[in-house]
């Protein structure tokens, strides 16, 4: 193989601007045969025209002047396979990882790390960051959105230029940026000094002067910009992961296995938040300044307690950077990619509006080609329908991921921590199981593009029917003093203050629910008029409460205390049924995720796959994940019956919701989004027109068929014919 002399690892030879039309002897070869018109018999004539060329060119490249004029590396610009390693260093032990399974393992580890940081550690640390750096919720909300903003801005450009580039190296860059973003996000802890404890707040009824309104701001809030920078860096790293990484997996495995591999990879990104929540929750039980110790009388139940939120980000930084070297050692294409591509058939959607394709092999290397490529994608009606269906699904999934714990907490009277645990136990395993099942079924039955869309339509239909579980799981509001119940007839409905607590000067900004022995729930011990408490009991108990009517009974329990910390035990028993049905709903919802991704990869031109994923994720965030929590928040706020109002008269968070109205509103938005999803899925099925049978997929355009074959097969045929 004289033509490859001097190239020890073709994967690391830079491609030249000019791509040769022929490559006579290279580790992998691309032959282009122009077809004047599409053959009605499945394209047999173009194959016959290739045979004489193959048989007459087994000679060294020196006999082919056009090819020899180009640099050796340019012969491999389209498809470069090579060993695993760095330049001239290719240890044999690394070659075991030079497989689709080896790449998938590292892809899963990076997706897991990204999920742990972005959707796990960041979310669970937001409330702690608010308190530590004295930020408003609007600022922390912008911190959370910064990741999606970065992803939207970069996704199109990264996916467009990365499609023709070295995708594993792009993922090495992604590992670096994810690690750097996690490191930057933790930096405020090291530069803001030691956390200073404030004075403890007495939650019982005390006669004192009313608190004064203070609108001063703290310099600590300036660390907001550091947190935003960290999120922007994390978004920069996440962009290649879900666009170029997915396309690389699709390149490296047969069509029927692609959905399985993609489903496994996506399931890891879903399991990441679960690990992030568990890890972050455990770290929050450690005091924030672990190196300086803590006061012996400070416990987690104290409102002044802050946990060590920053440790998880340092661990993620180290783990993400440990993946840089493994990704950098992969070749541009895994061994065997040429044969896999040669065996694939095209499923690209065909119609008049998308018939324009590019026969220039250099297309996609210049920024001037970017608008044309995007325009060509936007003309693909099937692609647009599939993307719109995913945006509708993303809207409700992100909305429920954000507010499902709040729904469970209010409907079933649970604590915030336990409600969050139950919500995570339903959402995360259900989503991961759905992704894997969807990929397994599509792979097992070797579904074509249209069948995968039909499969997604069916699963969405089942999820639509199951969405009505919110109506049957609704629970009546428990009696609440000042909201749904009066203070023994002495107070007014809708007013927490009554004659029994008028002298306590209670704060509505301090919500600490209390269950009285009369079965009525109170906003706080102060609003219940409680004067004394016993803190060494679990839960904390209160007595001498002027607003609680003491029942005269002979039971010891009634004389033990008048109220205990926490919400009253709900009389609603629908929680197990709700969790079971909602778990099944989540499975069917996410079963459509992998088939839709596979359909998008199949219905667009082969060279536009990464860009198609970039467009999908950009629109998915602009129309789904960014507005989703906002829309859900507005809808849930519309069901509020008691708002937090501070000393300055500024409305804050909602304390009490109308459970029945909340259930109905969530059903309405779920059904609406599911109907939109089903509509666009069905429209994509109707509009889809597959290419004629036998059309090859390997770097093909509509009027050009590019057959990818290995040089070993070329030489074998030449010897047989000679």
Swiss-Prot record:
It catalyses: estrone 3-sulfate(out) = estrone 3-sulfate(in); L-thyroxine(out) = L-thyroxine(in); 3,3',5-triiodo-L-thyronine(out) = 3,3',5-triiodo-L-thyronine(in); chenodeoxycholate(out) = chenodeoxycholate(in). The modification Phosphoserine is found at residues 15-16, 24, 26, 28. It is a multi-pass membrane protein. GO terms for cellular component: basolateral plasma membrane. Residues 123-141, 194-218, 291-306, 399-418, 471-578, 637-670 are extracellular. Keywords: Cell membrane, Developmental protein, Differentiation, Disulfide bond, Ion transport, Membrane, Phosphoprotein, Spermatogenesis, Transmembrane, Transmembrane helix, Transport. Strongly expressed in initial segment of epididymis and seminal vesicles. The modification Phosphothreonine is found at residue 19. One of its GO terms (biological process) is organic anion transport. Residues 494-549 form the Kazal-like domain. InterPro entries: Kazal_dom, Kazal_dom_sf, MFS_dom, MFS_trans_sf, OATP. Induction: Dramatically down-regulated 1 day after gonadectomy. Disulfide bonds join 500-530, 506-526, 515-547. GO terms for molecular function: organic anion transmembrane transporter activity. Belongs to the organo anion transporter (TC 2.A.60) family. PANTHER family: ORGANIC ANION TRANSPORTER, SOLUTE CARRIER ORGANIC ANION TRANSPORTER FAMILY MEMBER 4C1. Mediates the transport of organic anions such as steroids (estrone 3-sulfate, chenodeoxycholate, glycocholate) and thyroid hormones (3,3',5-triiodo-L-thyronine (T3), L-thyroxine (T4)), in the kidney. Capable of transporting cAMP and pharmacological substances such as digoxin, ouabain and methotrexate. Transport is independent of sodium, chloride ion, and ATP. Transport activity is stimulated by an acidic extracellular environment due to increased substrate affinity to the transporter. The driving force for this transport activity is currently not known. This is Solute carrier organic anion transporter family member 4C1. It comes from Mus musculus. The gene is Slco4c1.
């Amino acid at each position: 193989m004289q033509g490859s002399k001097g190239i020890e690892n073709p994967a690391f030879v830079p491609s030249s601007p000019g791509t040769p039309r022929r490559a006579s002897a290279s580790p992998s070869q691309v032959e282009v045969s122009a077809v004047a018109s599409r053959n009605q018999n499945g394209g047999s004539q173009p194959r016959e025209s290739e045979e004489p060329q193959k048989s007459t060119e087994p000679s060294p490249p020196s006999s082919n002047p056009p090819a020899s004029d180009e640099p050796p590396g340019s012969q491999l610009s389209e498809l470069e396979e090579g060993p695993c390693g760095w330049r001239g260093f290719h240890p044999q032990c690394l070659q075991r990882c030079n497989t689709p399974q080896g790449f998938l393992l590292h892809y899963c580890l990076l997706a897991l790390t990204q999920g742990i940081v972005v959707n796990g550690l960041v979310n669970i640390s937001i409330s702690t960051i608010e308190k530590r750096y004295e930020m408003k919720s609007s600022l922390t909300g912008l911190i959370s959105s910064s990741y999606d903003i970065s992803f939207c801005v970069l996704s199109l450009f990264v996916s467009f230029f990365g499609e023709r580039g070295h995708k594993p190296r792009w993922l090495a860059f992604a590992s670096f940026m994810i690690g750097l973003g996690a490191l930057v996000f933790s930096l405020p802890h090291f530069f803001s000094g030691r956390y200073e404890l404030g004075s403890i707040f007495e939650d019982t009824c005390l006669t004192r002067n009313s608190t004064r309104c203070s609108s001063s701001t703290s310099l600590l809030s300036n660390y907001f910009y550091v947190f935003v920078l960290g999120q922007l860096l994390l978004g920069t790293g996440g962009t290649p992961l879900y666009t170029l990484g997915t396309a690389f997996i699709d390149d490296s495995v047969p069509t029927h296995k692609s959905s399985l591999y993609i489903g496994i990879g996506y399931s890891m990104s879903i399991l990441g938040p679960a690990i992030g929540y568990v890890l972050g929750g455990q770290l929050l039980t450690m005091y924030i300044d672990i190196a300086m110790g803590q006061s012996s009388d400070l416990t987690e139940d104290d409102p002044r307690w802050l946990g060590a939120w920053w440790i998880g980000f340092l661990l993620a930084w180290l783990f993400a950077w440990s993946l840089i070297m493994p990704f950098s050692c992969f070749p541009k294409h895994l061994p065997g990619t040429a044969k896999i591509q040669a065996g694939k058939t095209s499923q690209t959607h065909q119609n008049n509006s998308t018939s324009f394709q590019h026969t220039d092999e250099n297309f996609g290397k210049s920024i001037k080609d970017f608008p044309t490529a995007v325009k060509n994608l936007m003309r693909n009606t099937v692609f647009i329908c599939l993307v719109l269906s995913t945006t509708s699904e993303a809207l409700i999934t992100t909305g429920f991921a954000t507010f499902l714990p709040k729904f469970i907490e209010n409907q079933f009277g649970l604590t915030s921590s336990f409600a969050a645990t139950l919500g995570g136990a339903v959402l995360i395993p259900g989503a991961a199981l759905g992704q894997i099942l969807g990929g397994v079924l599509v792979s097992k039955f070797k579904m074509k593009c249209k069948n995968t869309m039909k499969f997604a339509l069916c699963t969405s239909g089942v999820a639509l029917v199951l969405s009505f579980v919110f109506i049957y799981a609704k629970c009546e509001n428990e009696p609440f003093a000042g909201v749904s119940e009066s203070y023994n007839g002495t107070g007014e409905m809708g007013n927490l203050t009554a004659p029994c607590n008028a002298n306590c000067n209670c704060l509505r900004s301090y919500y600490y629910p209390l269950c009285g022995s009369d079965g009525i729930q109170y906003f706080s011990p102060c609003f219940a008029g409680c004067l004394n408490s016993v803190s060494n009991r679990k839960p904390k108990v209160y007595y001498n409460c002027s607003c609680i009517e003491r029942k005269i009974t002979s039971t010891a329990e009634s004389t033990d205390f008048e109220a205990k910390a926490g919400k009253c035990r709900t009389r609603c028993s629908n929680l197990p049924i709700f969790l079971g049905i909602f778990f099944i709903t989540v499975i069917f919802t996410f079963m459509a995720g992998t088939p839709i991704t596979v359909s998008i990869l199949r219905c667009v031109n082969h060279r536009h796959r990464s860009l198609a994923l970039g467009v999908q994720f950009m629109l998915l965030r602009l129309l789904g994940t960014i507005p989703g929590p906002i829309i859900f928040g507005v809808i849930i706020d519309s069901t509020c019956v008691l708002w937090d109002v501070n000393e300055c008269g500024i409305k804050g968070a909602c304390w009490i919701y109308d459970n029945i109205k909340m259930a109905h509103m969530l059903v309405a938005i779920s059904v609406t989004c599911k109907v939109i999803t089903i509509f666009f899925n069905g429209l994509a099925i109707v509009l889809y027109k597959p290419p004629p049978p036998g059309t090859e997929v390997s770097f093909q355009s509509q009027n050009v068929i590019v057959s990818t074959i290995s040089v070993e097969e070329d030489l074998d045929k030449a010897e047989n014919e000679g």
